[in-house]
Amino acid sequence: MESGYGFRFSDDDVESASSLTVGERLCAAFLPFVAIAEAVFFALTDCLADLLPPSAAASRHRRSAASSYLAAVARKWNHQQRGRVGIGCTSLTLRQLARLADESRCFSVNEVEALFELYKKISCSIIDDGLIHKEELQLALFKTPSGQNLFLDRVFDLFDEKKNGVIEFDEFIHALSVFHPLAPLEDKINFAFRLYDLRQTGFIEREEVMQMVIAILSESDMKLSEELLEAIIDKTFEDADADRDGKINQQEWKEFVLRHPNLLKNMTLPYLRDITTVFPSFVFNTAVED
């Protein structure tokens, strides 16, 4: 198999157990800076898999299943929650929904309301307080509430804009709005840059890229040889590090992405725009106050 950068790799380099894992998405374009957003949102929706019959969950085709999967979750959720809001899962007023939609610059009021249902389910999975704690995000992403994971730490840190140790609903909406089809390209570029700027120095360094790629692959069924990883990162920095100082600054990153637009293809999730079409029951059956 050959990558977009001209690398060739064999079965010894890549060991894959299932289709469309995080690692396979990463290696589909075969660059370290790919497939983060889609992996995150698929994982967030996958946290609701226990609401579906096992046969349905086992037989779905992952890439095309997002919409039908969320619809099934919506029907099940509305049936279970009819007539009550749930402890710790507060309601929103129409004014609050409108404010969040306006601040997002992308989502409609109905889309914010629909995403509120997803947020409530995640935020009540362990600690029933209507806030997403790191353990709850880890359970959503990796099916386990414990363990160390660099990828989880970075995603949580980017979502937790107020740095108070939890993800509030306005932060949840703000972070997901970056992946909306109508979100400015500049926002997508900046989000991807911040994900890899582990030390928050304003630069992406080689070691940071290596750490993040290893963390992502460790949660998938794919393994790459150390030699191949080094070769990929060498080529990436050769292309992106224009001033050859061993790190990628924000301007270099922007120019790199604009030369390789496929790097951000998974930073746009079309079904975020269709979320109310997929499950309109969210709009009419949720606990929203006038």
Swiss-Prot record:
EF-hand domain: residues covered: 111-146, 147-182, 184-219, 228-263
InterPro entries: CNBL1-10, EF-hand-dom_pair, EF_Hand_1_Ca_BS, EF_hand_dom
SUPFAM superfamilies for this protein: EF-hand
Expression sites (tissue/organ): Expressed in shoots and culms.
Induction and repression of expression: By abscisic acid (ABA).
Biological process terms in GO annotation: calcium-mediated signaling
Key words, A-Z: Calcium, Metal-binding, Repeat
Site (Involved in dimerization): S220
Coiled coil: none
Binding site for Ca(2+): D241, D243, D245, K247, E252
Any one GO MF annotation of this record: kinase binding
Function text: Acts as a calcium sensor. CBL proteins interact with CIPK serine-threonine protein kinases. Binding of a CBL protein to the regulatory NAF domain of a CIPK protein lead to the activation of the kinase in a calcium-dependent manner.
Record-stated family: Belongs to the calcineurin regulatory subunit family.
Subunit structure comment from the entry: Homodimer.
The protein's name in its UniProt record: Calcineurin B-like protein 9
Organism encoding this protein: Oryza sativa subsp. japonica
